Amino acid sequence: MKATLAAPSSLTSLPYRTNSSFGSKSSLLFRSPSSSSSVSMTTTRGNVAVAAAATSTEALRKGIAEFYNETSGLWEEIWGDHMHHGFYDPDSSVQLSDSGHKEAQIRMIEESLRFAGVTDEEEEKKIKKVVDVGCGIGGSSRYLASKFGAECIGITLSPVQAKRANDLAAAQSLAHKASFQVADALDQPFEDGKFDLVWSMESGEHMPDKAKFVKELVRVAAPGGRIIIVTWCHRNLSAGEEALQPWEQNILDKICKTFYLPAWCSTDDYVNLLQSHSLQDIKCADWSENVAPFWPAVIRTALTWKGLVSLLRSGMKSIKGALTMPLMIEGYKKGVIKFGIITCQKPL
């Protein structure tokens, strides 16, 4: 979601499980955040596509665009141009300054690259073209363009975000390397095999059809290209478990109404979807502890005089978002919400 320091060696990498109960059924309820209507669906664990009506999907796109049209300016004013979580040391009790939290957001990018295996000069040289799927106001794109000297293209549903991202690229003398446009992640306007790095930093949670989302990521990846998905998920279901507990789903439904998150899935679901495309080096990790300090920091910022004034000026969507933040913390603490990374490589 475009809203966001552990000893790297302490992180657990989980390869995909061939004995997963991929295919067992669970029931989901998709509530369109822009209306009181709901669409009842049945999905499978691993096949998590949401069979929403076309009108509901269009309402979702419009809702996401309007949400970020309204809230992105507030986020940039308070937190800067990286609209994603920071990466912290687990159980850190240090009260970081604003600059410390912004450094943690940069670390999130670096840790994601490290986890995906983009760690040495030889690997970095291979990255010539990057797509940032759900780019926000382009913080990741501009960082990656500078780091790799690569051509980066960011896509977002929000015209306000796309314009601001292009303006910032021009201001930072990066317009020749980083460009941004309004486009749908489920129907990307790019030819097959275009990008050496396919980057999705906290955008997957907005996708109503996870299978189509993954299919598009794979389609636009070049042979040998890396795919990095960093996203909010719900916990993995245990063996024999068909669905989340009702109280768990209730928390997710409330968050969905504010942040336009139509279909939660688990990291296991993502792994199985990627496995179905015969990708290589599929791995995932739970980084929930590494992002735990972030939402309390957002709340503390919102409760400052500057934060309150900015919230009121930004509008009702921002205010609703601030009021929903405690639910994110509750979900994390109760183990319902997980912050996951899933990476893989497309075969040559």
Curated annotation (Swiss-Prot):
Keyword field: Acetylation, Chloroplast, Methyltransferase, Plastid, S-adenosyl-L-methionine, Transferase, Transit peptide
Catalytic activity: gamma-tocopherol + S-adenosyl-L-methionine = (+)-alpha-tocopherol + S-adenosyl-L-homocysteine + H(+); delta-tocotrienol + S-adenosyl-L-methionine = beta-tocotrienol + S-adenosyl-L-homocysteine + H(+); gamma-tocotrienol + S-adenosyl-L-methionine = alpha-tocotrienol + S-adenosyl-L-homocysteine + H(+); delta-tocopherol + S-adenosyl-L-methionine = beta-tocopherol + S-adenosyl-L-homocysteine + H(+)
GO biological process, one term: methylation
Region (SAM motif III): 220-229
Phenotype seen when the gene is deleted: Slight reduction of fresh weight in mature plants. Leaves with high levels of gamma-tocopherol and absence of alpha-tocopherol.
Assigned GO CC terms: chloroplast; nucleus
Modified residues (N-acetylalanine): A52
EC number: 2.1.1.95
Principal place of residence: plastid
Transit peptide boundaries: 1-51
Highest taxon above the source species: Eukaryota
Region (SAM motif I): 130-139
Coiled coil location: none
Role description: Involved in the synthesis of tocopherol (vitamin E). Methylates gamma- and delta-tocopherol to form beta- and alpha-tocopherol, respectively.
Family the UniProt entry places it in: Belongs to the class I-like SAM-binding methyltransferase superfamily. gTMT family.
Name the UniProt record assigns to this protein: Tocopherol O-methyltransferase, chloroplastic
Organism: Arabidopsis thaliana
Gene expressing this chain: VTE4
